[in-house]
Amino acid sequence: MRTEYCGQLRQSHVGQQVTLCGWVNRRRDLGSLIFIDMRDREGIVQVFFDPDRADALKLASELRNEFCIQVTGTVRAREEKNINADMATGAIEVLASDLTIINRSESLPLDSNHVNTEEARLKYRYLDLRRPEMAQRLKTRAKITSFVRRFMDDHGFLDIETPMLTKATPEGARDYLVPSRVHKGKFYALPQSPQLFKQLLMMSGFDRYYQIVKCFRDEDLRADRQPEFTQIDVETSFMTAPQVREIMEAMVRQLWLEVKGVDLGEFPIMTFAEAERRYGSDKPDLRNPMELVDVADLLKSVEFAVFAGPANDPKGRVAALRVPGGASLTRKLIDEYGNFVKIYGAKGLAYIKVTERAKGMDGINSPVAKFLTAEIVEAILDRTGAQDGDMIFFGADNKKVVADALGALRLKLGKDLSLTDESKWAPLWVIDFPMFEDDGEGGLTAMHHPFTSPKDMTADELKAAPEEAVANAYDMVINGYEVGGGSVRIHRGEMQQTVFGILGINEQEQREKFGFLLDALKYGTPPHAGLAFGLDRLTMLLTGTDNIRDVIAFPKTTAAACLMTEAPSFANPAALGELGIQVVEKEAKASLENK
């Protein structure tokens, strides 16, 4: 039906007859002439109808926005005064000779001249996806997956599918459960990741595996999360962590070159401890120049418990954050930032405004200055590199609260005060994570997952001091987003059982949930390591959006609902009966519980 795409016509097509298919983006009547902007997935081209083609002109008068049409005509160059430099096709236009209205459109529920609500966009997603910016994002996503497949194939990786219906295993979030009709009372789980299957593939001898795969997590959603998401999943045998990072870094660098024409350069490597200490985050945005600076040693003897308490506590921390030009912040804004850090557990936000350093104590403004000597203030200003016009904010609490609060404040100030250089790309690797973290109930939980190997520890050493264990894990971070994460896996049964034990999984539960894995580890398991990238987040970065729903064709809301299809929906009672499931209404359930 078509010979060319609208958005691909150029001056090289001048003089050619073409047939286009697409939608009316806009119509303009200029006396005896009618112009339309015709759109398809590749872009927009101007088409005009003149009196010499009376039938086409008459039919064109019926056109309205979003009519689906076919146009045959001749490409010609625009007069110089009419060239539109803002359009890729702005140097040409199509003189229509034939017009077919394939399908008419009713008045649209979306307004192309105004910003529509996200609710409306998701309800009429098929219309929203016609917008050029949305089409471009999905084209970029397709380009990314095409590149990844080529790269992986060139490097000897095999694309192997793993099951969608599997067994529920604890991986940190709730599973989506699928009831079995054949095995009544039993449930499959949709995979949170192909983690165990890809490890089993390594045990099977497939030493380089990858898959672009859907994963599912039934968790409370945030703006950058979806209940179903896509991973670029990778696993290798007989490769060390640095070797895995090297090949994956090469892939991402080539991807950025192909999609953005940008060389990211060699990725710096930073330990988890350094990232938390300097940036208050394990995924630091290095485009932001501000850093957290430890000042506890300067404040141990001050008569101000807010500072002295954490400064003298081995589990405490006092850190300063210098904000260039921050002295201009109003009291109202300072109070707002004080309330902001309370979200992260901080009790408030002490500060020093630096107006004129040369005047000493007279050159600063601070509600805590009365507790500090001139020497201490000068030492703080020196250590933070403060200059006239700067602001210094303080965090004083346990180490986690200080890192979380000042880390979040750093990001917010970077955005609010335009201190973060949005034109830059700042990738890095973060390594050497703690293997375990406090679960808040006196136990430990795996920081990554329970199949991650410790670094340079035997099973006995791990059992004796699990809180000291460093995971042989690594995350790739770009502009403050964790785009990929992985680790060296446990390949010995004794170590795997030790980790399960530390996590409070007894031997019976180990056999019930992971018996197949423990059995597989008995038969010559090779050392293996891998990584998974979030395709959605990669696409967000490469298309310049901060909304994950902008890069997924048919996403869910933050309530895990599809407004277009109205999923989830109630199931047919007969189908539930076949599954042996009975829905208990809330009122009936409450009545039963009261009994």
Swiss-Prot record:
Q: What class of enzyme is it?
A: ligase
> What Pfam families does the database record attribute to this sequence?
GAD, tRNA-synt_2, tRNA_anti-codon
Q: Where in the cell is it found?
A: Cytoplasm
From the UniProt record, list the reaction(s) this protein catalyses: tRNA(Asp) + L-aspartate + ATP = L-aspartyl-tRNA(Asp) + AMP + diphosphate
What does the record give under GO molecular function?
aspartate-tRNA ligase activity; ATP binding; nucleic acid binding
GO cellular component terms, alphabetically, are: cytoplasm
Which EC number(s) are documented for this chain? 6.1.1.12
Which Gene3D superfamilies does the record match to this protein? Bira Bifunctional Protein, Domain 2, GAD-like domain, Nucleic acid-binding proteins
A single Gene Ontology biological process assigned to it is:
aspartyl-tRNA aminoacylation
Coiled-coil annotation: which residues?
Answer: none
Q: What keywords are annotated for this sequence in UniProt?
A: Aminoacyl-tRNA synthetase, ATP-binding, Cytoplasm, Ligase, Nucleotide-binding, Protein biosynthesis
Note the SUPFAM superfamilies from the entry.
Class II aaRS and biotin synthetases, GAD domain-like, Nucleic acid-binding proteins
Q: Which domain of life is it from?
A: Bacteria
Residues where ATP binds: 217-219, 226, 482, 534-537
Q: Which InterPro entries match?
A: Aa-tRNA-synt_II, aa-tRNA-synth_II, aa-tRNA-synth_II/BPL/LPL, Asp-tRNA-ligase_1, Asp-tRNA-ligase_1_N, Asp/Asn-tRNA-synth_IIb, AspRS_core, GAD-like_sf
Binding locations of L-aspartate: 171, 217, 448, 489
Q: Which PROSITE patterns match?
A: AA_TRNA_LIGASE_II
Quaternary structure and interacting proteins, as annotated: Homodimer.
Which family is this protein grouped under? Belongs to the class-II aminoacyl-tRNA synthetase family. Type 1 subfamily.
Q: What does this protein do?
A: Catalyzes the attachment of L-aspartate to tRNA(Asp) in a two-step reaction: L-aspartate is first activated by ATP to form Asp-AMP and then transferred to the acceptor end of tRNA(Asp).
Protein name (record): Aspartate--tRNA ligase
Q: Which organism is it from?
A: Klebsiella pneumoniae subsp. pneumoniae (strain ATCC 700721 / MGH 78578)
